[in-house]
Amino acid sequence: MHRSTNRILTTHVGSLIRPDSIRRHLRAKQKGEGYDAAAHAACLAQEVAAVVRKQAEVGVDVVSDGEFGKGISWSQYVIERVAGFERRPFDPKTGNPFTRGADRTRFPEFYAELDARDHVETITDTVAVAPIRYTGQALLQRDIDNFKAALRGVKVVEGFLPVAAPASVIPDRKNVYYRNEEELAEAIGQAMNVEYKQIVDNGFLVQLDDARAAVTYDRMVPPASFQDYRKRVRLYQDVVNRATQGIPTEKIRYHVCWGSWPGPHTTDVPIKDIVDLILRVRAGAYVLEMANPRHEHEWQVWRDVKLPKGAVLIPGVISHATNVVEHPELVKERIVRLAKLVGRENVIAGTDCGFAQQPFYQRVHPTIQWAKLQALVEGARLASKELWGRGGKAGRSAAKKASAKKRPAKKTAARKRPAKAAKKRRAA
């Protein structure tokens, strides 16, 4: 994993807005009408190449494939790659998992309106009915091969692929096979180890997306206690560490956010209450939501908390959930204040969460997505200038061209200084 050794590097959380061409194939596949697998595969390879090229053009350093290969959401995609789960008709007796939570209890009118607008409706449960085992090697290799091909001919620092952490695999899953949730989580972790290792073995960083680490608080407390919640998260993170056995620490990014949905989030657990649990996960980088108005103030926790030795902090300095584009100066401020606490070389600038948690959903307009990433890159350039006393070795992008144009003038000025000094001595 590269570090910000001479400038602030940039990245994002992974998912990017899918183009209509991919969505058309997915709609046909879901409906079972006129689906052409070969055409879909060709389209996917073409669009992954385009989105990687666009990230490079904007100036993002550590890029992803946009999660374009996932036909369902960031967490539900696993049902296409793991055996042992079954879709069953939704059982209203057990309650709709998407209508639970303290925030929803506090703002029922708001959430009723939001659900109606977003057409939120649960029609199936996902149930563990047999031994969980990984079967998605071919699908994953397709995504890996597309990403490798897309990276040829573009200049970026590194590539990563985001996947679901064990606790976030099919959230609110049901279980009729294993004795308890602990056994099911362990089985999922062992199955997902195959996916994690396959990504790293092909030369990429693996990012484990774990929204459930924080969201579980909103779902559990009340009626459960805070200690009950911490016990559950600790269990899940032990599963994460076992699921990444055999993978070098520096190849792992661990992402935690507070669920990403566009709600009040007044019942989110404060990071100060779980940062110790987050850092229990063995990872080379911790990718955290830190730019939204509910959590931005929490940068101050890093006054007292130390990163594990060798680890990197990837703070969200750009929000994914608003069409307001952050000013690069604000992005710079967010980066600099953290860099002064944890060390400039230990910060890579990122986004709060993905821009499209599933193929048919997007948090902002596509043009705004790219404008935000441009603001991220420019803010990182400004932060590099302040932290290193110069523009930083920007390497790519317009920042490099601008600095190249300025160099001759600086050298000329430097050559003139001795001459001026000599004139002063003669005058004396």
Predicted regions and their residues:
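Domain-level signal for soluble alpha/beta catalytic cores
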Residues: 1-428
